[in-house]
Amino acid sequence: MYWIEWIENGEKKNIVAEGWIEWAAILEDLYQKRFEYVEWKRL
């Protein structure tokens, strides 16, 4: 499992991804939106 946190419109948001494929898809989407802050940790 992977925990991902980012800031969108001044608000901190987070999600937990079950597997690495879901994690990679979420990160790709977040980076394409060019958020300034994205952090992730493996749980």
UniProtKB/Swiss-Prot annotation:
Highest taxon of source: Bacteria
What protein does this entry describe?
A: SPbeta prophage-derived uncharacterized protein YopG
- Gene symbol? yopG
